[in-house]
Amino acid sequence: TACKTGTTDSPADSPAASVPDADTPVPFLTEDEFPRLDGSTACIPLMAQMKADATGMDLLEAQTSITVSTTAYAWENFGLWSRSDSEDYGAQLLIVYEAPEYVKEELAEADAKLEQKAIGRDALVFIVNEENPVQSLTQQQLRDIYAGRITSWKDVGGADSPIVAFQRGVDSGSQTLFKKLLIDKGDGQLMAAPTELAPADMGGLVDSIAEYNNSANAIGFSVYYYIDQMYSKPGLRLLAVDGVTPGNDTIADESYPLCNEFYAVVHADAAPDSPQRKVYDWLDTDEGRRCIEKAGYVAVD
């Protein structure tokens, strides 16, 4: 059965900055030995940093070698189609955000044998035009906006203009987090988004908010790492939620209320001496955590 494919994202569209670290990593794999990766768009820079640190290859070269099939498709392909002992087919290690519920159900029905662990923390963030005077919204105000109960910015301290609320498709990792962290913790009500307000990829959502004809009226969401370091756009800014502005510090201490972890995943039967298992285990070491932080993410213990 052929693999499913989503929007294939690559770092050519998502440049990542890396801060040099005083602790020089010790390579433990060759470039050819490094496991095949897949996962979420927002994890591309981390995958590149992992490959550079684990093999000693140049970071820019590592960036050009990473492509992903995006969150839902990565989980499906990995859990339903690929095998740990395949030498030339499918990913061997995922670096990925949480799977959508329907994918979790598919994996459970297939009795997929996967092993996963949290390696980092990110956050769901809300994006508005910098001309919008609203600086912070409560979680309940956000729920009411996306349920269609609040329809004007004047009801949350802004201008007397309609709120244009963008969403993502059901396959996206950010839509999964949006539902889990916000909508499902309320009454679960979510208005349907017309196609033009549900771009296929995160870059498209950011572009749409920036370019919308009445852009000061628009609101959308992403994960913090993507909007902060991979696809920042002039004229946009992040909202505080419950008065807390998202940032590495407020995500690390979880004072920002909409945080969630992301994962490394291997097949449960991956051999102890396999490259994917070596990298999976390495992510728990001090050097592995430094790699995560060097790439700009928040590592978890």
Question: What are the residue ranges of the model-derived segments?
Answer:
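Exported/periplasmic ABC-transporter solute-binding proteins
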Residues: 15-301
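Bacterial Sec signal peptide processing site at the extreme N-terminus
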Residues: 6-11
